[in-house]
Amino acid sequence: SLIKISTEIIEDSYDETQDVFNLLDLAESKLYDITQGNIKKSTETAQSLVIQAKKKIEEISNKDGLSGVPSGFSDLDKLTSGWQPSDLIIIASRPGMGKTALTLSMARYMTVAKNIPVAFFSLEMSSIQLITRLISSETGLSSEKLRTGNLEKFEWEQLNVKVSSLENAPLYIDDTPSLSIFDLRAKARRLSSQYGIKLIVIDYLQLMTAGGSNKNGNREQEISTISRNLKALSKELNVPVIALSQLSRAVETRGGSKRPILSDLRESGAIEQDADIVTFIYRPEYYKIDEWDDEERTPSSGQAEFIVAKHRNGGLNNIRLKFVSSLGKFENIDNYDSPFEFQSKINQEGPKVNPDQAFESGSYREEGEDMPF
């Protein structure tokens, strides 16, 4: 198989009509398939697929738990049964709503509480900034205290004790700026092969480039290439891919509650089409709206709504969450000290991680920081 694949790569390399970035991506994909033992027939019989589907259904029904990767948010996990393998999930909002904070809350739960390996590609913030946010969430010390280093003796002790679980978490952060979709796919394959990654986060989609394959196209075509490749990556690695996305300014100009809708997605056509799940983060408090637009007119202070606007394989819902701005994290609105009552089917053992390699450091990038507070 290796000789056959190598011959195909060499033959394609002589074809001057081939785009070099597409060729590199195709070559790495074929070599990755060999290392993973994925060389198989391109088609399967209905009988074989039915047997596989029945086996999966039986595995889920015979155990009390989720079939996917748990987010840590109870109502969301009940709706989705966890983030499913091969799904592309879009989490979108206007700047300042807390996209990064929400996904960090999920990543913290997956890696610290459930020992599920997660890859986090941060194109906006440096890896040190992300880790500082996680330390704030884990220790209960405000981001302001951590930024200034103005800690009391007992707070230093609190920091040293509580950060140990974070040090050993199977979380892998890459903060390469202006990452191309082909570079991201190559990095994701290596992380999957080396660490058994079960979920990938990209923060955020509009900061990516399509590489050389779309150099003459417009931005909408470039976003289309990126979203299509992210969906292909989720299927290739058989893991959920969560891509954060910005919303257009149309949300700000609209009257009423300013709750986002699907058409608010930037370059929305391709993103909406490729995604299996499209969600929005909405905080009325951000717009100085002090109560929810429901019958009870309950106060909206310190609360957010996680809107599942598209769900290819399930239902839709608007899920209320608690937002702790001082710590930059989201929690279940009820009983958030015990965020999740089920057990995920995802293999939680994962590879053993060297604490010195668990986090990749990077340079600070202060501009354009998507801070929710």
What positions do the PLM features span?
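C-terminal regions of RecA-like/P-loop NTPase motor modules
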Residues: 182-197, 214, 228-237, 250-373
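Structural recognition of the conserved hydrophobic beta-strand(s) that form the central parallel beta-sheet
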Residues: 201, 240-245
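Short, small/acidic-rich helices and loops at N termini and domain boundaries
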Residues: 1-62, 97, 116, 139-141, ...
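Pre-Walker A adenine-sensing motif
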Residues: 73-82
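P-loop NTPase nucleotide-binding module
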Residues: 82-126, 179-193, 198-201, 221-229, ...
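Cytosolic-facing regulatory segments adjacent to core modules
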Residues: 78, 109-196, 210, 319, ...
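Walker B catalytic acidic pair
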Residues: 204
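Flexible beta-alpha connector loops of hexameric P-loop NTPases
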Residues: 143-152, 172-178, 209-224, 251-263
